[in-house]
Amino acid sequence: MIWQDGKLLSPGAVLPGDRVYHGMRIWDPGHSKVAALCHIHGEPPVRNARILYLGAAAGSTVSFLSDYAEVVYAVEFSPRPVRSLIRLARARKNIIPLFEDARYPERYLPFVEPVDLLIQDIAQRDQAEIALRNLIFLKQGGHLILFLKLLSMGTDKKREDRIVEVVNLLEHGGITDPAVLDLDRYHTGHTAVWGIYSLSKNFEK
């Protein structure tokens, strides 16, 4: 990724509303959890990668990922942001918009090739389970990044207990040593869980 003067930059075509620095788009950590992750904890492997992004919304973060990736499969189920996502995909040929519910990955299975990176950004009670269902697309050794909004999972348990619960679920599903990464500096109440998919570990279960 491209960094200049502490700014994360993106080399793609400038879109309306983008801030620009030295002719490149500024990837704002306050507007994108992926950018926040890069600023606080390091870069995920996005360059020339095949990425599946769950919860793409109107495609702001997806557009930045597409500047670096080979292809981004962008799943969104809300009609209004999907319209913006489709317009974006017309201008960026390596974005494939999928108007689907990420809880049912079998519905878009024919359209998604194996990916190097799976990003889950859906704030629902079953957000960890949604990530696990979509592991069918992730290559051996591929990376999973799950953005957790813990309040969306209910208030009946402590934050720490929720995180332990999610980590245990991911490990049981084949994610190796998931790291819990705080994003509060830019996104209050959000946590990232980042791990690597190991089929052999899954089989051991």
Swiss-Prot record:
Disulfide bond residue pairs: none
Name of the molecule in the record: Fibrillarin-like rRNA/tRNA 2'-O-methyltransferase
Record has tRNA processing as a keyword: yes
Summary of subunit composition and partner proteins: Interacts with nop5. Component of box C/D small ribonucleoprotein (sRNP) particles that contain rpl7ae, FlpA and nop5, plus a guide RNA.
Role summary: Involved in pre-rRNA and tRNA processing. Utilizes the methyl donor S-adenosyl-L-methionine to catalyze the site-specific 2'-hydroxyl methylation of ribose moieties in rRNA and tRNA. Site specificity is provided by a guide RNA that base pairs with the substrate. Methylation occurs at a characteristic distance from the sequence involved in base pairing with the guide RNA.
Record organism: Methanospirillum hungatei JF-1 (strain ATCC 27890 / DSM 864 / NBRC 100397 / JF-1)
Similarity comment: family membership: Belongs to the methyltransferase superfamily. Fibrillarin family.
Binding site for S-adenosyl-L-methionine: 60-61, 76-77, 101-102, 121-124
GO biological process, one term: tRNA processing
Keywords: Methyltransferase, RNA-binding, rRNA processing, Transferase, tRNA processing
GO molecular function, one term: RNA binding
InterPro entries for the chain: Fibrillarin (IPR000692), SAM-dependent_MTases_sf (IPR029063)
One Pfam family, short name: Fibrillarin
EC number of the protein: 2.1.1.-
